[in-house]
Every structure is written in structure tokens, then in C-alpha cells.
Amino acid sequence: MSVPLILTILAGAATFIGAFLGVLGQKTSNRLLAFSLGFAAGIMLLISLMEMLPAALAAEGMSPVLGYGMFIFGLLGYLGLDRMLPHAHPQDLMQKSVQPLPKSIKRTAILLTLGISLHNFPEGIATFVTASSNLELGFGIALAVALHNIPEGLAVVGPVYAATGSKRTAILWAGISGLAEILGGVLAWLILGSMISPVVMAAIMAAVAGIMVALSVDELMPLAKEIDPNNNPSYGVLCGMSVMGFSLVLLQTAGIG
């Protein structure tokens, strides 16, 4: 099994962490949760704009028109898909009601799981493609996606637990949303493999960079602010950028990057 695929699987499995936190009865600090989302956004923004996009544009045979065009395609494509999918409400992340609720709530829980699953699928592809192109960037993206998946697990397990009263069912449904990300990575592994030209890989990287920027700006940062309105999510973003930038410098100094 390839390292990029393992990273994708681990990132997707982080959904279970959020799921278990949601059913253990321990309220996760909103401040920590919001900071982790900002931290993940910072990692994604720095990697996307300072590493992935420049590397894609510098690839042999890649034209600026194609490179920036794919970046914009990934950006707008994510925003369009995001508008069509149901969203979790931050105030529902820590819902603790254990009484089964009406069927309407069950339907909402199913739609929420479906929406997050569809949202996670391209993230799995993005993680695999990034790690396949550059392993050090793959580690960074996998970490950012894993941090992002923890509150997603919370988002799924809350309404499902409230709708069914079953911890096992809630964890199962949260796991399904995480498996969608793993499925995206597996499909990328099966379809792309090593038989892909540098130009095609660079184009995919540019599109993935656009997806990551949109995810950070449109979802992670606003969600962090909604979860913890009393603190600025920019602190987490700046910390994520600083830590990721410092780690990349260390790797390049050591001759790994």
C-alpha cells in the first residue's frame, strides 16, 4: 500500500475521533475546536498558495493559462458544489439529547451525512494527489484534513445520536462520512496510479490548490468564528501557516523537500 494512500486513510479516519468525542459526554472546548479549524485553514492556505500552485505552474509543459485556469476551476467548482450540499450548523455540533426525535430530524441527519460524505470525497482525492506529487506537502494536507474531519465527525454524530438515541448508530453514520474520503483516495490510487503525465498531474495540483483555498476561506474560517465568536480565527490561521512554513523550511534544509 502506497504512502499517499495511507495518509488519505488516516486523514479520513480522523472523523471517528470527532464521532467518539460526540458520544462520550465530554464537551470539547469550543475555543480549541475553533483554533484547530483556523490552524487547518492556515496549513491549507500556505501549502496551496506557496507550494502547490507555484509547483504546478513551474512544471514542464504547463502554461500559465492552463495552470491558473485549473486553479480557478477548482476554486469555483468547490464553491458551486458547496452551495448545493446541506451544511452542519455549529450550534448543533455538541448536541447531547439522547431522546429519539421525529422522523424529520432523522431525515435531516441522513441529508447531513450525505452532504458531508460528498464533501469529503474530493478531499480524499486531493490528499492522495498532493501526497503523490510531493510527500512533504502530502503530510501537511493530511494533517489539515484530519483536523478538519474531527468537527465534521461531531457534526454528523450529534443529530444522528439525537434522532436514534443509539451511540453505535451515530458512530456508524459518522464513519460513513469519513469512509467517503478514503474511497476518494482509493479511486485516485486505482485510476491515476503512476501512469500520469507531468502536465496532467500539474493541472490536477492547480485545481486541488483552488479547492483547498476555497475550503479554507469559505468553510473553515467562518465555521471557526461561529463556533467561538469571542476569539479571532486569524490566530489559528497564522499559527497554522507559521508551523507549516517552519516545517517546510526544516525539511528543505535537511534535503528532504
Curated annotation (Swiss-Prot):
The lineage of its organism: Bacteria, Pseudomonadati, Pseudomonadota, Gammaproteobacteria, Enterobacterales. One of its GO terms (molecular function) is zinc ion transmembrane transporter activity. Mediates zinc uptake. May also transport other divalent cations. Disulfide bonds: none annotated. It comes from Shigella dysenteriae serotype 1 (strain Sd197). Belongs to the ZIP transporter (TC 2.A.5) family. ZupT subfamily. It is a multi-pass membrane protein. The gene is zupT. One of its GO terms (cellular component) is plasma membrane. Zn(2+) binds at E123, H148, E152. This is Zinc transporter ZupT. NCBIfam families: PRK04201.1. The chain crosses the membrane at residues 5-25, 32-52, 61-81, 109-129, 137-157, 171-191, 195-215, 236-256. Fe(2+) binds at N120, E123, N149, E152, E181. The keyword Membrane applies.
